[in-house]
């Protein structure tokens, strides 16, 4: 609190001194030399708002009559070429059939899938490799499945279907997966599946439109997903000891339903 005898300024003089101090501080602050950063207040606010929709119009997709957007077709991007290689081992008992059928095996791999193929006698394997002419990304996998199907015992003409159709599969299971059999019981189960002169196996193949290979106690089935299911059910019934005549009847019923469906 000031002393009562101290001189006091009038309010008008105090306000003038404060305004002079503020103006001096403002003049001391440097202004930017570039006028580009300054906002031109002479521009009308409506012009900027009108230009914005024109800029967005180029980015908005065109729509058809139903309101669905129309996009321009994507440009093809060149894929980076990379050498990929697969090696399929060949069992000893399939080397001789492979050498015999080799003139029928490599043409579809080279001409259709554009792969480089060679049979390595030393390592007993078939080597597959992509080339610059290979366009299908799944060509190497298809070629491996084709060679594996031949090594499992399928005919070349049946295995070629894996290259032409995409919905074919190979399912493998053993008799012991269904029922534990040993000795003569195992042989009788295999005999029931094959039938006399292979008639039962052929009947299962024709009814289910699949191909079946009996390799000792292993069973390989080539076909579509539903067709494999039909063939597997028939084979499992025979392994469990069901009468073959009853299995034939079930196959006729299923085959009739499949014909009506297709």
UniProtKB/Swiss-Prot annotation:
The keyword Nucleus applies. The gene is PNO1. CDD domains: KH-I_PNO1_rpt1 (cd22391), KH-I_PNO1_rpt2 (cd22392). This is Pre-rRNA-processing protein PNO1. Disulfide bonds: none annotated. It is found in: Cytoplasm; Nucleus, Nucleolus. Keywords: Cytoplasm, Nucleus, Ribosome biogenesis, RNA-binding. Required for small ribosomal subunit (SSU) synthesis. Has a role in the processing of early nucleolar and late cytoplasmic pre-RNA species. SUPFAM superfamilies: Eukaryotic type KH-domain (KH-domain type I) (SSF54791). Belongs to the PNO1 family. GO terms for biological process: endonucleolytic cleavage in ITS1 to separate SSU-rRNA from 5.8S rRNA and LSU-rRNA from tricistronic rRNA transcript (SSU-rRNA, 5.8S rRNA, LSU-rRNA); endonucleolytic cleavage to generate mature 5'-end of SSU-rRNA from (SSU-rRNA, 5.8S rRNA, LSU-rRNA); proteasome assembly; ribosomal small subunit export from nucleus; ribosome assembly. GO terms for cellular component: cytoplasm; nucleolus; nucleus. Residues 183-235 form the KH domain. Residues 14-23 have a biased composition (Acidic residues). Residues 1-34 are annotated as: Disordered. InterPro entries: KH-I_PNO1_first (IPR055212), KH_dom (IPR004087), KH_dom_type_1_sf (IPR036612), KH_PNO1_2nd (IPR055211). Component of the small ribosomal subunit, ribosomal RNA processing complex (SSU RRP complex). Its main location: cytoplasm. One of its GO terms (molecular function) is unfolded protein binding.
